[in-house]
């Protein structure tokens, strides 16, 4: 038979002692339960008192420090993280913390709930409940000077409108449905110098996006033009233009833009400085039937002097031509 080592003997002795103490405690507890009915062992009263006191103390400690992470002392002004219910009987205040759970009902919460119920009943029954009595003096009706009062109201309204009109810059408004970025012109009559904005609404020049200082420069417009049809410069609607345009320079007014609308030169994209037919793409009918420049894409310099060299130069044409390939026959 193998000999026992000292460690194994020590383990056996410890197990035996624990088992003996456990059995004795179990027997004592069973005897105490029987003594409650028969009152045979007065020592059990002391055991039960100590047990109840320990349970109460552990419960209080568990309610005070239950499911939270605290940094420092849990007094008024300290910060901690708590996970659980709040206890109203604690000697410290629970503030500046992150809590997950329902708190115990407080007096303020009850007052808020009662006020919400009163407001809901007031809305349902359409009754007026006066919460406070104001200590201010009752307003006096000045029936002596009604005209003076009306005049002051009108003056105030005009003043507010003027201030709003002067401060209409660098803002986004969705009442009049536009977004404007830039400075407002100092002259109120000059409506064409409003620059760098996008407007969508009921405006004389409506539904467009403009970027620049001039009237017809670097903007995209979509919609009807309110001016008369007789004005040729105002007929440019539904187009996108990029460049410097002016009323005096006709060549500069129609350069580097894409236009879509009812225009003699309509539905085309042009890139160049001159009003001649150069460096552009046009799609549509030309009002002059004898002119050969329709439905084509041309890239090159155009001029009026050298007709042969400029008529059929670096372009792609799709359509019928009035002059059928004069350059090819002459070449």
Curated annotation (Swiss-Prot):
Keywords: Amidation, Cleavage on pair of basic residues, Neuropeptide, Repeat, Secreted, Signal
Modified residues (Phenylalanine amide): 71, 83, 100, 174, 181, 200, 211, 222, 242, 260, 271, 283, 299, 318
Signal peptide: 1-25
Biased composition range(s): Basic and acidic residues: 146-158, 282-296
Propeptide stretches in the record: 26-65, 86-94, 103-168, 184-194, 203-205, 214-216, 225-236, 245-254, 263-265, 274-277, 286-293, 302-312, 321-331
InterPro entries in alphabetical order: FMRFamid-related_peptide-like (IPR002544), FMRFamide-related_np (IPR051041)
GO terms of biological process kind: neuropeptide signaling pathway
Role played: Excitatory neurotransmitters that directly modulate chromatophore function by activating chromatophore expansion at the chromatophore neuromuscular junction.
Protein name in the entry: FMRFamide-related neuropeptides
